[in-house]
């Protein structure tokens, strides 16, 4: 089979203005960015206000291997499959970060014959939204350090007399806003800024700082959760950058930088329209990771797609304990709109990896045996799929299991897994279909599409795990105990102090976003299957007042990834004709 990029390159694509018209997007709603991608103006929602909404299908997965289990392939394949059975459909996905593109996973455009195209445009820069997020975020960081420098240089009273501005009295030891970049770079996790030559202070005040990856930026979360430009402006103003010497928060509004940050983001708020290899309209917008952020594409893109189509297919990052949980408890509560159906992607290799019969270690390649027939391991790993089905169902949703077929998979094991799903009593609607979207495109996903249409005939009774009116502790416990199946949570001394500060400043009404490993339902990546009776350790709590959640760092999760020993960038090059090679 040809490589992903070769398949994409060999496929004749439709001009984006025609894709837009077929989807119901008129020329005045569109800002073309060349012939194969365009920005869609959020003002389209004014024209579509009276149109009914279609069904929202949320794709999730079992606990994945580091290779991923084909969730984006399934999302794109399902959209193409729905189009094959004559349903109006739009897919909504996140913009890929260049960190994973150059790191371990490679691109995030799907694969095989279920891709968003051109895949190299999607995976590398696209329309620059992530760069806009990075610029807006780092503008706030630069403004904060500049204000700190000038206030300390002059003294608070003299600074106010000179500028007419109130002194913010920034506590240099309580600055919470790091810088960001769209690369994996572990060397930048802990740095010192403001270093000067002896006797000089022209470079600012020396302090400890660090970088996160742009996908973990609160500005990225704000982009994904804003309803419109005015909402984004207000949210950016609420971002807390530091605390003053009295312990009170200093916001982007206080620093008078929120307006400029929003100006930097004014085009990023427009979703980007592209197409699948079969000409299905796809909206790409925002790119928060699901392990260290909330892991879903934007509310704006969903709202546009729901008004234009019978079915909107979107995805939450990693397994149902990750992006799916955050879609249901964060995104849905802010959008006032829950999904109508959950699709759980499962693979033979992924279930075998969760069997407990293989010695799997983080950072090491999967053993060759896991790709070979092994019914014992498949049966043992089935507990993980059952866990994810029941987890999705507890939100009141009908569930469809999509068994994503790989070339090495045998018919015997695929049918065994399909029968195990069909023969298990889940006390809710659970459909199952084998998806061959990777190798056959939409034609290979029509069985899955029909199963999803049938599932959506069952009315959803969507209900998040918690109400925003509950306390932060109750919300953390709800996610850990109900969302993960843990026995309890355990707050570090640092987290307890931060919790008290959050309550003091009136942030008890925010959602919670738990950052943890995606490779286990627990916070330990080495624990596979469907564990229970474990504790979720919360080491740190961070306020994301603009995004509307409190960020809980659990276990050893890092907000700036590092590159592996053999990164994916080693495979990338460009030929004499300007064609990119090695991107997957």
From Swiss-Prot:
Gene3D superfamilies: Domain 2, N(10)-formyltetrahydrofolate synthetase, Formyltetrahydrofolate synthetase, domain 3, P-loop containing nucleotide triphosphate hydrolases. It is an enzyme of class 6 (ligase). GO terms for biological process: tetrahydrofolate interconversion. ATP binds at residues 65-72. It comes from the Bacteria. Belongs to the formate--tetrahydrofolate ligase family. This is Formate--tetrahydrofolate ligase.
């Amino acid at each position: 089979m040809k490589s992903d990029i070769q398949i994409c390159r060999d496929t004749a694509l439709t001009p984006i203005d025609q894709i837009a018209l077929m989807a119901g997007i008129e020329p005045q709603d569109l800002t073309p960015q060349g012939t194969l991608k365009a920005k869609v103006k959020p003002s389209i929602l004014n024209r579509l206000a009276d149109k009914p909404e279609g069904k929202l299908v949320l794709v999730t997965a079992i606990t994945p291997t580091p290779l991923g289990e084909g969730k984006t392939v399934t999302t794109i394949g399902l959209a193409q499959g729905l189009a094959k059975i004559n349903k109006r459909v739009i897919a909504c996905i996140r913009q890929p970060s260049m960190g994973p593109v150059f790191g371990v996973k490679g691109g995030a455009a799907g694969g095989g014959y279920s891709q968003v195209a051109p895949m190299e445009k999607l995976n590398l820069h696209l329309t620059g939204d992530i760069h806009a997020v990075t610029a807006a975020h780092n503008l706030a960081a630069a403004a904060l350090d500049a204000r700190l420098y000038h206030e300390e240089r002059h003294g608070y009273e003299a600074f106010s007399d000179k500028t007419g501005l109130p002194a913010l009295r920034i506590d240099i030891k309580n600055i919470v806003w790091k810088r960001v970049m769209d690369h994996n770079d572990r060397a930048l996790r802990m740095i010192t800024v403001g270093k000067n030559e002896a006797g000089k202070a022209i470079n600012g005040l020396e302090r400890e700082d660090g970088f996160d990856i742009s996908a973990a930026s609160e500005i990225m979360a704000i982009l994904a959760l804003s309803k419109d430009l005015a909402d984004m402006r207000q949210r950016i103003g609420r971002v807390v950058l530091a605390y003053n010497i009295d312990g009170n928060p200093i916001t982007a509004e206080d620093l008078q930088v929120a307006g400029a940050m929003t100006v930097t983001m004014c085009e990023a708020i427009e979703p980007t329209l592209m197409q699948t290899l079969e000409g299905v309209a796809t909206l790409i917008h925002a790119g928060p990771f699901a392990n260290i952020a909330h892991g879903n594409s934007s509310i704006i893109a969903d709202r546009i797609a729901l008004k234009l189509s019978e079915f909107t297919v979107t995805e939450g990052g990693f397994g149902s304990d990750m992006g799916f949980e955050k879609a249901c408890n964060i995104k849905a509560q802010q959008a006032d709109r829950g999904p109508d159906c959950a699709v759980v992607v499962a693979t033979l290799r992924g279930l075998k990896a969760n069997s407990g019969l293989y010695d799997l270690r983080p950072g090491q390649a999967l053993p060759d045996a896991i790709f070979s027939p092994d019914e014992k391991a498949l049966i043992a790993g089935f507990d993980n799929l059952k866990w994810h089905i029941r987890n999705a169902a507890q939100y009141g949703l009908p569930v469809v299991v999509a068994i994503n077929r790989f070339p090495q998979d045998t018919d015997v094991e695929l049918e065994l897994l399909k029968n195990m799903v069909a023969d298990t009593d889940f006390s809710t609607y659970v459909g199952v279909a084998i998806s061959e979207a990777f190798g056959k495109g939409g034609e290979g996903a029509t069985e899955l599409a029909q199963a999803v249409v049938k599932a959506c005939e069952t009315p959803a009774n969507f209900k998040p795990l918690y109400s925003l009116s509950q306390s932060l502790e109750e919300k953390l416990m709800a996610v850990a105990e109900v969302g993960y199946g843990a026995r309890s949570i355990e707050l570090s001394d640092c987290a307890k102090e931060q919790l008290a500060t959050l309550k003091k400043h009136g942030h008890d009404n925010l959602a919670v976003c738990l950052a943890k490993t995606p490779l286990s339902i627990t916070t330990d990546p080495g624990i596979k299957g469907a564990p229970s009776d474990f504790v979720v350790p919360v080491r740190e709590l961070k306020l994301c007042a603009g995004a509307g959640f409190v960020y809980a760092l659990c276990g050893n999760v890092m907000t700036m990834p590092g590159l592996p020993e053999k990164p994916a960038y080693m495979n990338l090059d460009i030929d004499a004709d300007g064609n990119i090679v090695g991107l997957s």
